[in-house]
Amino acid sequence: NEPWADGSPHPIGQGGFNGGDGITSMHHNAAGTRISPTEIWESRNPWLVKKIELAQNSCGPGEYRGGLGLDLEFEMLEETYVTTVVERTKFPPWGINEGGEGRANNVILNRKNESSNVPKKTGLKLHKGDSLIFKTGGGGGYGKSSLRSNKKILNDLKQGYISIEYAKKHYPQLKV
């Protein structure tokens, strides 16, 4: 096997702000960069991308909701070593002016029908068939969720950004 290395900072949701929802899947990295296409990851690294999707309900509620994080899953195709450096795993992104918290970052290791949370900074020896699941954070909301318009809530539901359960919990003013 050829040596390889990949440094992949994963996108997160930006917090809502006075006047707008947070940006979804924002890449906080060097200017002008973006997340690598799945095909590039798979062609250059010994893993299979099993999932990469917007994380429903990861946004913090508010008049202006936070942006959504991502759910990514990588299955290892051979034995390999991985280093993870993930911040904001214990304390989720806070909301502002009574907005709600977004989802915290989390990394999960699936190994032979066993799941465990990965420490925020660690090195791991992974075996063929092991999967790493990255759940990137969603942004906190801005303003009281009771002030979010019904039109925006319905659009979030239509887009799949939030579930009906999430909407009922955080937006009691919802009229379906």
Segments (PLM) and residue ranges:
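Glycine/proline-enriched, intrinsically flexible loops and inter-domain linkers
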Residues: 1-176
